[in-house]
Amino acid sequence: MKASDIMHPEDAKAIQVLRRLKGFDEIVRISMQYGYEQIYRGINLGNLVKVNAHNLPNLYLAFKNVVKRVGIKEPELYIYNDPEMNAYTYGETNPFIALSSSLVEKMTIDEVSCIIAHECGHILCKHTLYNTLLRTITELGNLFELISAATFGPILVAMYYWHRKSELSADRCAAAVVGERTYQMAMLKLACGISDIKGSPYQLVEQARAYRRFEKDSWWNRIQQNCRVTFYSHPQMVNRAWEIDRWKNSWQYKKYRESL
């Protein structure tokens, strides 16, 4: 799989804007100099459970299959105890993927593979450096109040904007690996947190149509919604579902589905 085939156009544009921001290169340099990536590796080894062929064999096999399909070097896979369904990937030189216990318990193995493929998409598209950087800046600011809105506000706004767009590229990777129908069901479970939800997996796509009508009803609705998501790390769930529902008709999606 090639990053260029799944990269969302808005992701590619946003990262170029980010790199042109004054002070951004210096932040990247400092982050690499002080090895913030090692902080997260220490957290993983100290508090999470590393998945292998012995402790969770079915999950590990599914993980290896996804990694092979995406075509990246195998990252480390961890499980952490959390009642919220979630997953993340960080690290530039030695990336890792972490899945919450709730996600593994509430989703089918195909749906978990979808989430793993999403995280592998971040690695394939080389998002992990900036993902790690964004998390580090945010956590340092929360802990030590080092970040002032005047100094880092524009950079943070730009980074969050890019991060939301990067999720769309990773979603394409997930849909290409497991199929868009499985992707839609996984997103539905992530949105509601219920493992045995019934009905069509395309419920979020239908809601997306309603949401878009809501935004178009008035300029005030559009302003409210745009301001509300400024510091969101992820696009709203209906927008993610909508984007993949559109992308499933593309030649890139069809090429990868036919080759698997």
Tell what function each PLM region has.
Residues 1-93, 156-157, 195, 217-218, ...:
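Hydrophobic or amphipathic, alpha-helical segments that drive membrane association/targeting
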Residues 191-260:
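Pan-zinc metallopeptidase signature
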Residues 50, 54, 99-114, 158-164:
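Short pre-active-site segment immediately N-terminal to the catalytic Zn-binding motif
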Residues 120-139, 181:
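Catalytic Zn2+-binding segment of zinc metalloproteases
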Residues 133-153, 160:
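A structural motif
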